[in-house]
């Protein structure tokens, strides 16, 4: 009698490509052969291309995964399959509280809340690498994860030395397992704001000063305007333009060409939120879309932010996902209750996560 171990490797790989990434544990526990194949063949390549998104976020000082399936939207049932769960980090570091997470090339850079260490984690392979900083971490430190032209991964750390004009840049090289200091003068205000994205090894962000890449619209000059960065399946940059205290028109642009000193943009979606029927009165009124991603095929964007609900005695915040699209489409889903101190940490740290086979030797 034939079993799953008798299936040809080509057929197994085709099965792997259609199974969602969230089924990885079940696949690996099926048999030793499937477990071995999953270590050098990525699961869910075709499934991920069919309106299924896997993201990561930090909530309650723990790393959580958020899975969102948009295949059922704009249908007769108009179903949205959304789930969030805390995920375990292997190698006995699961109890470490995390304050920040950065993403690049399928890897997650996790910063310990007690500022003791940094850790790089490959969720797909289940591998981690603990890295001791050259100097003790500071809560104002900024980080970026990327790689060079030879695919050597590196960590950039911007050390806050007590003054906005006293910033040191450390670089950790995975290949040499060592830190070095860059001899560069930089003002703290030139560094990235609340969100940044990594695309093909480079990190992009909005800074208050310094050279700007061209945009389709004028960069915000008033305090109530907001720009949020994202990327499209590690292929293109995307930017969301919105208002902080009132939602009028939102605009999403995607890059068509990226050069070292120039980016070409095109408008993907422009929506007048005042024309949407059933839009809640408090829709992102007291916050903003901290992160977002979108589905090019279905012409919808998923905006993540927090909404405040004020009761007679208490005030509560909910992490919310809002799906908006052309022709007035709108649907909102409350994800979970969060505390005020967690609002910044609840933003997504990857846009349409794609697994990686990058080995972490630790």
Curated annotation (Swiss-Prot):
Source organism (scientific name): Arabidopsis thaliana (Mouse-ear cress)
Pfam families from the UniProt entry: F-box, FBA_1
Descriptive protein name: F-box protein At1g54550
Domain F-box: start-end pairs: 1-47
Coiled-coil boundaries: none
InterPro entries: F-box-assoc_dom_typ1, F-box-assoc_interact_dom, F-box-like_dom_sf, F-box_dom, Gal_Oxase/kelch_b-propeller, SCF_F-box_component
PROSITE patterns referenced in this protein's UniProt entry, alphabetically: FBOX
